[in-house]
Amino acid sequence: MPSTTRVLIRPEHVTDYVDIAALHARAFGNRTTEPLIVALHRSRRAFDPELSLVAEIDGRLVGHVLFSPHQIRLLGSTVPAVNLAPIAVEPAYQGQGIGGQLINEGHMIAASKGYLVSFLLGHPTYYPRFGYQTHAYGSSHLLLPLEEPSQEPLEVRSPAEEDVPALCELWQHEEQGVDMALFPGRDLLDWLSPHPAIQARVYLHSGTLVGYTRIHQNQPTHPRFFLARDAETARAMVSTIAKKLKTQAQDLLFTLPFHPLSASAQALGKATCQSWEAAMACELGPSPLPDYLAQVRAEQHPIGRPLWPTLFDLDE
């Protein structure tokens, strides 16, 4: 059995990129999704190579974990956080505590940099031993039937560099009250999907940007990401999308990822939430997380939900 007595945990180097990609492929049954997600993370402005850690034994790379910096919303505050994803250990070395060493070291480094929360989607019997609490967030949706197509559909096009400030303002307006909401970022690539079947679009009214969506071509009535200036705009966006479909309007029911605390939700209908056991969070420093979780568990506050960054569109 391989020995773990000489495990070295260190930040990645550029020369590790090929080995890290191959490691994730082997650990995930030759899937290429995880290597691609790691590579895309490195193109983010917030990427920190000191939070991309490798485990080495006798000069051989046997493990890797990535903690990606984000800004999340919790109880009305913006909290510096990290997302643990992905993590991989060489199959021959699994079950020997290497993953735990990577996680613990990542927690210490992230905390030293001022990050207060770590969150992830993972196995609910493994991660709690490192301080993660299950059912920390989940998903939400609002069902919106298409009542009558708008006579004047909105202008629709791909996002451009000059749209990013308006997109950030739109996100702030729509999502600032939603717990666990993730700020997408201030670069164009934060708003463009790397998945060839998922299109990012902006919506304009009289030249003003009023909406944004990311939609999979096979799920046109189930946007993955939906931001609107207000409820009227949301209806106009749905109508504009519907005009491009061949289905009869009366048969269309849109599932929008609104949360009960989304700015536009109340005027559109009832948004419902579902918690996930695999959705976990861990406090790295003093933060609103314990109060948020206590309120959620006492049913005094709706459970939060993130709309995931574009690079996770690859994880289909």
Say what each PLM segment does.
Residues 133-149, 228-231, 239-316:
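Active-site/acyl-donor-binding loops of N-acyltransferases
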Residues 50-54, 64, 86, 198-202, ...:
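Short hydrophobic/aromatic beta-strand element in the GNAT-like acyltransferase core
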Residues 2-69, 77-83, 148-185, 220-221, ...:
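Short amphipathic alpha-helix that is part of the acyltransferase structural core
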Residues 107-122, 247-258:
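Conserved GNAT acetyl-CoA-binding A-motif
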Residues 134-227, 231-232:
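Amide-forming acyltransferase catalytic core, primarily the GNAT-like/NAT-type
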Residues 59, 89, 97:
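Conserved G/P- and acidic residue-centered "switch" motifs that form tight phosphate/ATP-binding loops
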Residues 85-94, 223-234:
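A short, internal acetyl-CoA/4′-phosphopantetheine-binding micro-motif in the GNAT/acyltransferase core
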Residues 92-105, 115, 232-241:
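Conserved acetyl-CoA pyrophosphate-binding loop and the N-cap/start of the following alpha-helix
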